[in-house]
Amino acid sequence: MKVNVAVSVAVVFLLTSLLPAEAQQTSKATPRIGFISSNGAPGSPSALFDAFRQGLRDFDYVDDKNIVIVHRYAEGRLDRMPGIVNELVQQKIDVIVAVNNVVIRAAKEATKTIPIVMVSSIDPVAAGYVESFAKPGGNLTGLAHLGRDLSAKRVELLKVLLPKMSRIAILWDTSGPGPTVAFKEYEAAARGFKLELQSLEVRGPHPDFPRAFQAAKTEPLDALVVVANPLMGEHAKQVLEIATKKRLATMTEASRYVEEGGLISYGPNSADLYRRAAEYVVDILKGAKPGDLPVKLPSKFELFVNLKTAQRLGLVIPQHVLVQADKVIK
């Protein structure tokens, strides 16, 4: 009898070992990835979300097949962010993907154990998110950019477009650590180019942009740098309309502002960041600890120029700038 039992167990073990790997995995819990967007709405198309999913597919992780992506939207209502993050934490999600500083901060406050992957963060060390780039520590890692060089490059580009530029304004949201770090970087860049800088400040969730522009000094401004974040993104159309009426050349890091009427943008290629964020998720699902995965910098950058806006402002964009541009809106 004992021999028969032993033989039966051996046969079951043999048959199980011969099953395809995919069939064996069905007994395991399917990994669940929480993806949180500060803007957008359920069902709305998102090229960046598609880039993230493609990044996962490149490693054979397919949504609704061997992973589940739980996508949540704040729909521009940033005050909802803590509640959205806490909902995913309560669901015991396996990884949280935080697309920007607003989501990163909410996720970091909500959990010390669930891995968090940053898609884009202004200097995470200065913001207090990680201990260092090489050894983040804790439960957070991902992609970030050191804005000092990028801020200087943006101011330099404005100087190329406006050789006589002497005064610039920085429009920024004072309610978050990311824009605060960025503003300090632009202060340093302005000093480097011997420019006078005017701070135009707003604060979420109900920013008063007309008042912010009225707070500018009586001397005319030459250009406006918009520090991109979810609050600015939500009100981009209003901001750009005011800037254009005041005949201000606008610069920002995000190409979407140029597509909505801004003059020029220079910054990391967003789709590439989302694809690379997927690589972090894959590493974590395979057992890596986020605190041991170094924070990486962008490797691809893009320059967008809006010729229609330039014409409205009476500006002529130099040919060498147009040749370098990844996209020119005519």
Question: Model regions: which residues?
Answer:
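Short hydrophobic alpha-helices and adjacent helix-cap/hinge residues
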Residues: 1-330
